[in-house]
């Protein structure tokens, strides 16, 4: 009796997380494999290729505040608006420069924030 792949997928879809965990453990025991080792072995070559691709096209950027310049109050206002920080936290961030203002933002957002901070008198860098 052959079991269709769709039937297997439907049965798995109806399982709880605990049942899935037990199923994986039983499959590892029956076939003498480890699901974690397979994931690491597959991910390792991709990481090497991904590093080269990441160097070519970076998608997440960090806006670094190098110095507040002469208009520190204006820079604090921009930092507060961009990050949602409170006055004290924004002031501490500006006083502690060089520091990251925002991390993991798109190129457009990073450039817009850099422009706002520079207009306020800050020295800014996008990494």
Swiss-Prot record:
InterPro entries: Ribosomal_bL12, Ribosomal_bL12_C, Ribosomal_bL12_C/ClpS-like, Ribosomal_bL12_oligo, Ribosomal_bL12_oligo_N_sf. The keyword Ribosomal protein applies. One of its GO terms (biological process) is translation. One of its GO terms (molecular function) is structural constituent of ribosome. Gene3D superfamilies: 3.30.1390.10, Single helix bin. Pfam families: Ribosomal_L12, Ribosomal_L12_N. One of its GO terms (cellular component) is cytosolic large ribosomal subunit. The keyword Ribonucleoprotein applies. Belongs to the bacterial ribosomal protein bL12 family. NCBIfam families: L12. Homodimer. Part of the ribosomal stalk of the 50S ribosomal subunit. Forms a multimeric L10(L12)X complex, where L10 forms an elongated spine to which 2 to 4 L12 dimers bind in a sequential fashion. Binds GTP-bound translation factors. This is Large ribosomal subunit protein bL12. The lineage of its organism: Bacteria, Pseudomonadati, Pseudomonadota, Betaproteobacteria, Nitrosomonadales.
């Amino acid at each position: 009796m052959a079991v269709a792949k769709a039937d297997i997928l439907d049965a798995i879809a109806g399982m709880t997380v605990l049942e899935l965990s037990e199923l994986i453990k039983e499959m590892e025991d029956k076939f003498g494999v480890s699901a974690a080792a397979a994931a690491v072995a597959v991910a390792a070559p991709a990481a090497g290729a991904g590093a080269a691709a990441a160097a070519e096209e970076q998608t997440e950027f960090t806006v670094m505040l190098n110095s507040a310049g002469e208009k520190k109050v204006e820079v604090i206002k921009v930092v507060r608006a961009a990050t949602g920080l409170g006055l004290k936290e924004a002031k501490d961030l500006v006083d502690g420069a060089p520091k990251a203002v925002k991390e993991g933002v798109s190129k457009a957002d990073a450039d817009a924030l850099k422009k706002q901070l520079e207009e306020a008198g800050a020295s800014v860098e996008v990494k």
